[in-house]
Amino acid sequence: MISLPSFFPARPASLAGRAVFLALLLAFAAPAFADGPVHELYPEAPDASPLPSAGRRLGRRAPRVAIIIDDIGFDAALAEAFLSLEIPLTFSLLPHAPHRLDLARRAADAGVEIMLHLPMEPLEYPRVSPGPEALLSSQSGDRMAERLSAALSRLPQVRGVNNHMGSRLTGLPAPIHRVLSVLRERDLYFVDSVTRPGSVCRAVARRLQIPFADRDVFLDHDLRPAAIDRQIEMLIRTARAYGQAVGIGHPHAVTRDALEKARPRLMEQVQLVPASRIVQTAG
C-alpha cells in the first residue's frame, strides 16, 4: 500500500478545500463518480482552489472514523445484516420508514447509534421528492419546526440528525438556522450530508454553537464492489490525514459485504466510533 504523503495540510474547513484534498487522494484511489436522484449525492470532484496552508497537526491519537448508514427502516433483514458486522456504525433512519421503531430498538441494543435522516427539499423538487413530511423552502419557519419536532418524536432514541437530499434547503441560511435552532434546544448534533456545493450548514452551526460535522466520503455512489473498496480506502486516508472522517453508505448488500471485507483493515488503521464522537462545536 502506498503511504499517505506527509505534506497533507490540516483539515480544510471549506467544501472547496476538501474537494482539492479529495482530488489528491484520487491519485491513489480514483473512483467513478455518479449522481443519482435516490440519494442525491454531490460528486466529490476537484476544483481550482489553492491547497490550504498547513495548520495544527493532531497528536498520536488513533484517527477516528464514523460510518453512517442512511435510509435505514425499509429493509429490516438488510439492516440486521449490517448489525451483524458488530462494528460501531451509526444508523440514520427515515422518519416515515415502516420498520423504524423496531430497528431503532434493535440498533440501540446492539450499541449502534441512531440518527434521524431528515427529508429536505432538493433542487429538483417537485420532480424529485424527498419523501413524506419533508422540509420545504416554501414553508414558514414555524411549519418547518413543527415537522422536525414531529419527525423527532417518531424516533426518541436519536442522538443527531443528517439531511436526506436537501440540496436546495441546505443552501438557504434562514431555514437551516431554524432547523439547527430546534436541534440546539434538544441537545442534538447535525451532520451535513453535503449534497450540494455552497452549503450553509457549517456556518450556521458555528453561529449557533451546535455539534457539527460534514460528510467526507460517500461509500457507495458507485455500487461496484471495487469502487466501494476504493471509497473505504479514501475514508481511511482522510482520517489518517486529518485525525477523523465521516463516511456515508446506504443499505445495500454490496455495501455491507464491502464493510465486512474491510473490517480488519478498518480496525487496524482507525478507531471506528459513532457519529457523536466525531462532531465538534466550532470555536
PLM segments and residue spans:
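N-terminal signal peptide c-region/cleavage motif recognized by signal peptidases
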Residues: 29-30
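Substrate-binding cleft of extracellular glycoside hydrolase catalytic domains
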Residues: 106-157
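Bacterial N-terminal signal peptides that target proteins for export
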Residues: 4-21
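Short, flexible loop segments at boundaries between secondary-structure elements
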Residues: 276-283
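Catalytic domains of cell-wall/extracellular-matrix polysaccharide-remodeling enzymes
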Residues: 138-232, 240, 250-271, 277
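Active-site beta->alpha N-cap acidic-glycine motif
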Residues: 58-128
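Structural preference for beta-strand elements that scaffold enzyme active sites
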Residues: 64-66, 88-92, 113-115, 159-162, ...
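Terminal interaction modules at protein C-ends
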Residues: 2, 33-63, 232
